[in-house]
Curated annotation (Swiss-Prot):
Subcellular location: Nucleus
UniProt cross-references to SMART domains, sorted A to Z: SANT
GO CC terms, sorted: nucleus
Native source organism of the sequence: Oryza sativa subsp. japonica (Rice)
Residue spans of biased composition, Gly residues class: 15-27
Origin organism lineage: Eukaryota, Viridiplantae, Streptophyta, Embryophyta, Tracheophyta
GO molecular function, one term: DNA binding
Biased composition (Polar residues): 157-169
Domain (HTH myb-type) ranges: 26-78, 79-134
Major place of residence: nucleus
InterPro entries found in the cross-reference section: Homeodomain-like_sf, Myb_dom, Plant_Male-Germline_Reg_TFs, SANT/Myb
Pro residues bias spans: 320-336
The protein's name: Probable transcription factor MYB58
Domain of life: Eukaryota
PANTHER family to which the protein is assigned, alphabetical: TRANSCRIPTION FACTOR DUO1, TRANSCRIPTION FACTOR MYB58-RELATED
Amino acid sequence: MARAPGGVRRRSGRRGAGGGGAGGGGEALRKGPWMAEEDEVLLEHVRTHGPMDWSSIRSKGLLPRTGKSCRLRWVNKLRPNLKSGCKFTAEEERVVIELQAQFGNKWARIATYLQGRTDNDVKNFWSTRQKRLARLLRGPLPAARPNKHNSGKGKAPSSSSLDSQTATFHQSSASLDQASLEGNSLGWQCREAAPFMGYDQACSGFFAFEGPLPLQLLPPADGEASSSNAAQSAPPPLLFDQPPYPLINFPGWPERYVDVGHGFVDAGAMDGLAYQELLPMVQSVPMIMPFFGMECAHDAVKHGAFDDLPPNMFDDAVDQPPPPPPPPPPPSPSPSPSRDDVL
């Protein structure tokens, strides 16, 4: 080192002895991505000398890379026991948390306690963990406000709301149908009716009753439930223009003229030629009273049904002239004038 005039030191000597640069050959340093040929040279150096003496790689002219670049390439990419792409295990996370509390952000030092992990792996893990904890501490994000452009009156409802409305509609319809069915099944019940005539049936042979009394349709009593279905307990309505004459039990009656579903004669069975075929059968059987369930037995009528009555029973009621009208009342006398009126 030569001293310049005036006491100022001046650096002297040749620059870059040996043809420029310590690496020999005057080759410039290379930066950027590594090539496959460079990785092969670095691996061969490690197999020969071990993972050390990184500066000698450039001094020997093996690679135009610095010692630091060669070391980082080996540690982060070329080591055989690297766990690249693997998540940290629970044990590794525990070690990183404890060592970070002890050493601080010394990632290279912490990585020496984890086999197959680099300082970059430890640093990335810690940064991701801190961000996740920050999101948890902030709590759930507030609900997004509806956009003014999308919150118009013509906004279509969501599929979930449509499904809930459809389910509610079907449930209401099912409830209404069930209530209607129960009302039809419990609305009318058959009960035995009381005798509708009060005369002595034993003394009168004009009508002959056969079988039980007819059934009358009455509304159900309070709290009374019917176990039968609607088809059994709710008879079809009576149409007065076509009275239902039960003809199923008549002997020899053709089945084609009987409505098996309700037990009544078809409405059109008496039309045309069917009338000529059914008329003898109708005349050969006793007549059935449609509403009272009574049979008119002509044989039961006695020719002398009135023999027991007294002979003069109808004398007073037959061939007697009407009684004469009563005489008119006499006229009432007019009042005589008083003495005061005359004076």
